[in-house]
């Protein structure tokens, strides 16, 4: 196993103090902690996001759209796994009903897009797969693990008056304008399950030490992210707040009482 290096990302909407076990760089509002993608699995990026207030309403292009726009080879589909939520905290994913592009653009300009979105109340353990093109936003008081395609192409549609660039033309072009499919919402109930099944990556969860069968992974490397607890991987500890590159995890000795996220590209 190899632990991935971390990068602390300063954001205007970040928190003044990171939760345990993260150290907090002084005099910075940290919004994200990134794990540097390893060369062996550079298709995937794992990060923590800590939202102190509502974040921008945004969407991401898919692979074909990103390539057509000259923005690289990858679009961005992602999965959010909620790690902490204050009482009543919400995230927005998808619209209440089908709308047209003109309505979306006007709503983004006047801020009413916030009311057109469905705000889902969340709890730790909830998971939302967010395909490219899905209009989404994170509410205040939410922390989560994001597993995503390794791309940072974001089109902001509305940002609550913050002095950051918006991308209305591109955002409207790539956005899906209907409700979010409920089948893409999941929850880590039980000891094992599949949160995302392609097309770009698969994301499993598994409780180490349980009677549940280990996930059926394809041969090769995987990213292992402890959601809770600490796991020993071939004698080396991996804890909450860390992400490890594990070669052939189905053949590794995983010992401990930990709930793990396990990600692999398709």
Tell what function each PLM region has.
Residues 155-221:
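C-terminal amphipathic alpha-helical segment
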Residues 84-124, 129:
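Intrinsically disordered, low-complexity linker/loop segments enriched in Gly/Pro
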Residues 46-48, 55, 72, 78-81, ...:
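His/acidic/aromatic-lined binding-pocket segments of jelly-roll/cupin-type domains
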Residues 117-129, 232-252:
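Short acidic-glycine-tyrosine-enriched beta hairpin
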Residues 50-54, 64, 74-75, 85-88, ...:
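Ligand-binding loop in jelly-roll beta-barrel domains
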């Amino acid at each position: 196993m190899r632990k991935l290096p971390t990068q602390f990302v300063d954001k205007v909407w970040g928190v003044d103090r990171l939760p345990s076990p993260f150290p907090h760089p002084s005099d910075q509002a940290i919004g994200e902690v990134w794990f540097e993608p390893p060369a062996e699995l550079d298709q995937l990026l794992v990060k923590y996001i800590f939202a102190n207030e509502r974040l921008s309403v945004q969407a991401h292009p898919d692979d074909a759209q990103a390539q057509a726009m000259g923005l690289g080879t990858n679009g961005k589909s992602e999965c959010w796994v909620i790690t902490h939520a204050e009482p009543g905290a919400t995230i927005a994913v998808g619209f209440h009903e089908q709308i047209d592009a003109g309505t979306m653009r006007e709503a983004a300009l006047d801020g009413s897009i916030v009311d057109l979105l469905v705000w889902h109340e969340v709890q730790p353990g909830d998971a939302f797969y967010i395909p490219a093109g899905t209009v989404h936003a994170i509410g205040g008081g939410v922390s989560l693990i994001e597993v995503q395609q390794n791309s940072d192409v974001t089109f902001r549609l509305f940002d609550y008056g913050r002095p950051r660039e918006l991308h209305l033309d591109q955002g409207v072009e790539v956005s899906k304008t209907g409700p979010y499919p409920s089948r893409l919402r999941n929850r880590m109930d039980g000891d094992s399950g599949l949160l995302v099944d392609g097309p770009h990556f698969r994301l499993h969860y598994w409780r180490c030490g349980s009677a549940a069968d280990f996930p059926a992974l394809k041969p090769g490397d995987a990213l292992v992210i402890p959601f809770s607890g600490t796991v020993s991987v071939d004698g080396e500890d991996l804890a909450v707040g860390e992400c490890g590159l594990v070669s052939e995890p189905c053949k590794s000795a995983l010992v401990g009482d930990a709930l793990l996220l396990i990600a692999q590209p398709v």
